[in-house]
Amino acid sequence: MRASLSLLSMPLNKYAPQVATHRRTQRAILQATKELIATTGLKKMSMIEIADVSEVSRATLYNHYRDKESVLLALCESELARLVEIAQKAPDATTALEQISVEISQDKALMAMRAQDPDSLTVALSAQTDTLWKAFSIAMAHLLGSEKSELAIRWLIGQALHPINAQQSRSQAEAITGIANL
């Protein structure tokens, strides 16, 4: 009985500070990666530059990610999760689509990829059988319903390649959400 009482006095999560540090480090690495894509370009960016810009040691970077591709995958996961979060916080489906559209159209990393590395961008956008795309598709289906989500995702992919302005984002989001039956 005494042993179980001592367990109750232990902190709920003794690893919370380590987890928080891990998350901050990951955020710094992913933010640095996105900045480097925007300034240096995807192909020219190196793991050494990612470590330097994120202000972590190379060993720390490699403890988190084994290579540039794994950093890029984590960045894609993070960005799609961010877009889903934007959609979930929006007051309605039209606003959600509009906000996601503006984020995609104004993203500096996507802008740089369109100019410097369109082939990699096209490959990434066409890999819609990937688990990341499936998760994004499911989240969009919860927001819009399955038929509208298919249209909305294709519309958003188009903006990664051919961005639109904020006014177009609003009017086109209204058109998509206004469709009764496809």
Region roles according to the model:
Residues 1-40, 44-53, 70:
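Basic, helix-initiating cap at the start of DNA-binding domains
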Residues 32-36, 74, 103, 155:
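Short amphipathic alpha-helical elements of helix-turn-helix/winged-helix folds
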Residues 52, 66-67, 77:
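Residue-level detection of the helix-turn-helix DNA-binding "recognition helix"
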Residues 54-65:
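Short hydrophobic/aromatic patch on the recognition helix
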Residues 70, 74, 81-108:
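Hydrophobic alpha-helical connector segments
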Residues 101-127:
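Amphipathic alpha-helical segments used for helix-helix packing
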Residues 106, 110, 146-169, 178-182:
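Amphipathic C-terminal alpha-helical segment
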Residues 119-154:
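Amphipathic alpha-helical packing segments from all-alpha helical-bundle domains
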